[in-house]
């Protein structure tokens, strides 16, 4: 748990977990369809200009950009899966184009961190990630 202290050091705010990730999109309907139907992310609800999904207890908010700004492709969503090879094959079968195949990006005692990168229809980078025991 992280503690963020005020300048005076007398009050603190305890940040216990990530609650929501926001991604600005240009075509909300198309992106809602992609995340819900192609990736299979559970859809929670929609509000004017926004769609919300559940990523294992962390909410994903797709939203139209604020007035005067545009959608940016800066953040990467890392989607944790138990079997990266199976998840990759399933998404390829649904027509999701990947930038490459799943591969190890880091080795640590007893395992490896594997990733596979792809983009949504608006060019936002996403990745599958999985800790693989060796």
PLM regions with names:
Residues 53-57, 118-121, 131:
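Active-site beta-strand termini and strand-to-loop segments that position acidic
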Residues 50, 65, 103-107:
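Short, solvent-exposed loop/turn elements at beta->coil junctions and helix N-caps
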Residues 16, 22-60, 66:
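Core segments of cupin and vicinal oxygen chelate
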Residues 28, 77-125:
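Vicinal oxygen chelate
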Residues 48, 55-57, 71-74, 93:
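Short connector loops at helix/strand junctions that flank enzyme active sites
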Residues 59-61, 69-70, 124:
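Short, charged/polar, Gly/Pro-enriched secondary-structure boundary elements
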Residues 1-29, 59, 75-77, 129-134:
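N-terminal beta-strand motif that seeds the catalytic metal site of vicinal oxygen chelate
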């Amino acid at each position: 748990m992280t503690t963020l202290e005020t300048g005076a050091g007398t009050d603190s705010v305890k940040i216990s977990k990530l609650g929501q990730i926001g991604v600005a999109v240009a075509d909300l309907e198309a992106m809602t369809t992609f995340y819900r139907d192609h990736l299979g992310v559970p859809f929670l609800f929609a509000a004017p200009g926004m769609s919300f999904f559940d990523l294992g207890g962390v909410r994903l908010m797709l939203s139209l950009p604020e007035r005067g700004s545009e959608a940016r492709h800066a953040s990467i969503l890392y989607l944790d899966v138990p079997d990266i090879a199976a998840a990759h094959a399933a998404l390829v079968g649904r027509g999701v184009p990947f930038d490459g195949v799943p591969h190890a990006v880091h080795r640590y005692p007893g395992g490896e961190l594997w990733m596979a990168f792809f983009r949504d229809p608006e060019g936002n980078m996403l990745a599958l990630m999985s800790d693989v025991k060796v």
